[in-house]
């Protein structure tokens, strides 16, 4: 059995920065504990990555809160999460979901029967980047078991954590 952990956007701006929430702060210990249950070669992380022109982008026009500008403190992964990740692969993504991540998972599982493959997803924000990546991965790897650990996720607002129901409807297991 090959099991991969994907840690989505555990960045300072989403935890205690410009888009931070108490719920995001509350999951940091759970996220670190989860990372520590995996070997580092089975852990991937994403980093929301924007440029200085963020407010002129479609996302910036719809969410006019500057965040995760490449190279800033807010863009960096939480220091404790980064330490737990060790040498895990971290990929920048310019949008909510990452096709590059899905392609990497296809390569990770190449030659293995789908029933011997599993992906677990944790991180921020449940209702934007977690759900986007989960659905891209499910579309790209429809027979691979994909799960989300709700105790290691937080939404933009407590009620938007309801994105977990959307994922369940798309055959993503929520724990």
Language-model segments: what does each one mean?
Residues 44-47, 145-152:
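Short internal beta-strands
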Residues 32-36, 131-141:
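Histidine-anchored nucleotide/phosphate-binding helix
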């Amino acid at each position: 059995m090959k099991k991969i952990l994907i840690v989505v956007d555990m960045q300072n701006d989403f935890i205690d920065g410009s888009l931070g929430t108490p719920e995001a702060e509350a999951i940091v210990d759970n996220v670190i504990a989860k990372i520590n249950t995996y070997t580092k070669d089975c852990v991937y992380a994403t980093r929301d990555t924007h440029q200085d022109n963020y407010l002129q982008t479609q996302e910036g026009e719809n969410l006019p809160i500057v965040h995760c500008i490449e190279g800033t403190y807010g863009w960096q992964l939480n220091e404790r999460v980064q330490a737990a990740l060790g040498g895990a692969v971290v990929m920048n993504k310019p949008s909510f979901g990452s096709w590059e991540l899905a392609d990497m998972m296809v390569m990770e599982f190449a030659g293995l029967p789908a029933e011997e493959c599993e992906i677990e997803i944790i991180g921020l924000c449940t209702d934007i980047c977690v759900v986007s990546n989960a659905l891209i991965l499910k579309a790209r790897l429809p027979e691979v078991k994909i799960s989300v650990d709700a105790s290691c996720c937080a939404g933009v607002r407590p009620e938007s954590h309801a994105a977990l129901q959307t994922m369940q409807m798309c055959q993503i297991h929520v724990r």
